[in-house]
Structures are given as structure tokens and as C-alpha cells.
Amino acid sequence: MGEPGQSPSPRSSHGSPPTLSTLTLLLLLCGHAHSQCKILRCNAEYVSSTLSLRGGGSSGALRGGGGGGRGGGVGSGGLCRALRSYALCTRRTARTCRGDLAFHSAVHGIEDLMIQHNCSRQGPTAPPPPRGPALPGAGSGLPAPDPCDYEGRFSRLHGRPPGFLHCASFGDPHVRSFHHHFHTCRVQGAWPLLDNDFLFVQATSSPMALGANATATRKLTIIFKNMQECIDQKVYQAEVDNLPVAFEDGSINGGDRPGGSSLSIQTANPGNHVEIQAAYIGTTIIIRQTAGQLSFSIKVAEDVAMAFSAEQDLQLCVGGCPPSQRLSRSERNRRGAITIDTARRLCKEGLPVEDAYFHSCVFDVLISGDPNFTVAAQAALEDARAFLPDLEKLHLFPSDAGVPLSSATLLAPLLSGLFVLWLCIQ
């Protein structure tokens, strides 16, 4: 349910052809993979099959003979054959590697390299490497990237910082999805905001007032799933008037594993604000309490957000609210003594741009009769300003009255392509 999928956008190439050090990093990156996951073997075979292309081979080997790439430069044929073999190996082990962040990073790295070198998906593959001594350079002293530092690990593998997504839920609740759709929802009871291989977030809502369609989030449950070498599974639960600065087990980090400090919880305003940092999956979460409701805001790495199966498709952060659960602004029912003009004036003080956040503020103030709802919308906008990688998408505007709010630009997000790729390897 939710918004229909959008066409994947092609990735832009970036960086220079991979060096031996970069290829070795592919091997090092996956050193923490689960024992049944064979991504370590896939990386070792790829590094081995490309050694002759890294300056030590003959000119014939560099040219690769046999057209692996379309218009590629020196070595493109041999490199394309190696990349196709690498991709085939990852597909064969995909089922046992599901949920392994290193595996997903390697899959996207292959895609990037194939695009950079104009490699076709169909064609000859590299012969299996001969069994023999350890790979040259495997023990060269190059430090392995920290498996619990997602941003650092990704940057070393891809030569660029990772992409991030933002989602928020506040007020009525209003949900801003990863794809910049903005919905006002009537969802009642427990609904998943996120449900992927690394993170589960559930919001529980109840009506703002007796007989009202609009609801407000009264409880948030967040599960950080067990990740080898980094964290034990941790559960955080917040309710109105109970915003703890600790996980359910009383801890404030990811546990006693080597990367336990890569998950932490802190506050700058006890009882009203909690921030959870999950560096091992490139994620920051902010939870606030305002006007008797809870607000949720997240910045999360693209690969993490899109690591889910078809059975996990109901996620408000991914598809927005299901059509049957959406409210239009025309459905508001004023409660209390606040007029529309007063509500607009109150919201305008902190939200000068009449965008989705402004209209959500007016909606909430009118339907609740509580001026404190202005704070929830203002905080959500500030989180978006801090979390969005592209500030041109900060302000979203209604397409017309009575229709759910959507992005003014209506650009197809690149993330659809990542999602399609994930489905293809299952």
C-alpha cells in the first residue's frame, strides 16, 4: 500500500577506476559477515581475478580482449568479465546474506563500477581463480575499516559519502516520507513507520478528541536489531509523559560488543527530547514530546532504509499513509475557541513560508484548540533542515485543496532504483 513505485533513475558515475587498495577494501569490508554468508569468498575471487589488471599484467591482459565493456577504456573487457562474475557470486549467496549490511554495500558497489566502465550485464565472465597462496597485498597492513562506522566504511569503499533519507511524523500525525510525499493521516492503533532488516519503528496513535478523525501519536517503539560485532538488539519505548533516556534494559549504548558505542542515546531537554545515534547503520533519530503527542524524525542511510522484503512493504516512511487512511485539509473540524485567522497567525510566527508544515500547523491548532501544536510543526521543519541532504526539497507545497500534500518538484527519487535492485537479488 502507499504511493506507487517510481521509475529508477540511473546512477551517476563518480570517482576513478578502482585501485588494488580499493579492491582489497572490498575484502576487508566484509570481514564481519555472518558465517553462512559467502560474501567474503565473492570478494576474494573478485580481487584475485583483477590482480592482472592492476599494472602488473601484460598489455594484452590490460586490454582484456573480447569486448566486455561498451566503449570502455584500457582493461574494460577484463574488468567487466570480473564484475559480471562478482555479481553472479553475490546473487548466488543473496539469500544467506540477507540483512548483512556489508553484502548490500558490495552489491551497490558492483553496480557503480559496472556503470562507470560501461559494462553490459550479459556477457562472458571471468574464469574461477586458481587455488593457491594468500592474495598479494592481503596482509599489507592496510587497516580494515571499522565495521561499526557506516559512513566511514561506505566512503572508503565508494570514494564518496553515502546518501541519506529523511522521514518525519508529527502532530495529527502528518507524515513526510522518504520520497517527499506529505500526508495527513487518520491512522489509529499501531502502524509501522519503518520495518527493515536493521530497524523497526512503530507508532501507536489514538483520536485527538472523542469522535474526531484526527489522531495523535501517544507511543513510539523502536527496535535496533542485533548486528554482529556492533550491537546487541536494543528496544527503546517512549510514551506521552514518559520519554526515558535509556533503552528498555536500562543501558544507554549498544552493549558489550566491540562496537557497542556505535549506538548511543542522549538528551538536551529531559522529558521532552531524546536523540539516538546509530553510527553502525548511519542513522540519527529524534523523538520529541509536545502538546500531549510524540514526534518522530529520522535521518537514515539509503541502503539501510531500502533493505526490506516485499512482505515488509507497509511502512509509512516508505509509502506514506495508505490512501484509505489519508485526511485532506477540508476534513478538519475546529474544536475550542481558536479561529482560522488566529491559527494562521500563530503558525505564521514560526513558519513564515506557507508550505506543508505551515498548513499542518494550522490543521493541528484548529482541530485540537491547542496553540502548543505550533511547536511540533516548527521542530519538524528544523529537523528536516538539518537532516535533508537537498535543501531544495525542504519546503513542500499542496498541489491543490483537498489533495494530500506532495513535493512541488515531483522528481522521481533515486531510491526507487535501489529498491528495485534489492528485489532483483532476492
UniProtKB/Swiss-Prot annotation:
Feature type site, description Cleavage: 172-173
Gene Ontology cellular-component annotations: BMP receptor complex; cell surface; extracellular space; HFE-transferrin receptor complex; plasma membrane; plasma membrane protein complex; side of membrane
Name this protein carries in UniProt: Hemojuvelin
Signal peptide range: 1-35
Disulfide bonds: 148-230, 167-317
Localization terms from the record: Cell membrane
Noted disease: Hemochromatosis 2A: A juvenile form of hemochromatosis, a disorder of iron metabolism with excess deposition of iron in a variety of organs leading to their failure, bronze skin pigmentation, hepatic cirrhosis, arthropathy and diabetes. The most common symptoms of juvenile hemochromatosis at presentation are hypogonadism and cardiomyopathy.
Family: Belongs to the repulsive guidance molecule (RGM) family.
Domain of life: Eukaryota
Assembly, per entry: Interacts with BMP2 and BMP4. Interacts with BMP6. Interacts with BMPR1B. Interacts with TMPRSS6.
Organism of derivation: Homo sapiens (Human)
Membrane topology: Lipid-anchor; GPI-anchor
Modified residue annotations for Phosphotyrosine: 46
